[in-house]
Amino acid sequence: MGGIFGVVSKKSCTLDVFFGVDYHSHLGTKRGGMAVYGPRGFSRAIHNIENTPFRTKFDGDLDELEGTSGIGCISDNEPQPLLIQSHLGSFAITTVGKINNQDDLIRSAYENGHIHFMEMSGGRINSTELVAALINQKASITEGLQYAQERIDGSMTILILTPEGIYAARDRMGRTPIVIG
């Protein structure tokens, strides 16, 4: 399981993201992360929260995470949000869900071109990185989000933070809800 949270504001959003992600702590027990966009560009922090609460781990990061838009997550799996640089520009991405056909998508990515993935412990590929790779196969983030949702067998809800704002995409079956407002 996991939970994701995002904020776009006219003022600093750091505390809103901090407390919004902390509120989701009951949804995951292994990793927590936050990414914000501000005057200095993207800033990110990811911590292991297996033995220490989210608030305790991230309290010291708040001064470095200054911006007016941000996303964060609690995850039982991979570390995230990830910072991506591609032909679509720079963005941060976080996901919650399960990709049932992950091995097939990875194999297809290797067969179709020049791509690599960072390997995690145990030889696993970060599913959030795989989603970013799918998105990056298209000409825009919106086209990429649609393409990723079409290719994924399973459930994947996604937040993407760009310098312009946040893209939110609920999984196509509605298993993992997303609230905007």
What is each PLM-predicted segment?
Residues 1-181:
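Conserved short alpha-helical segments that host acidic/polar catalytic motifs at enzyme active sites
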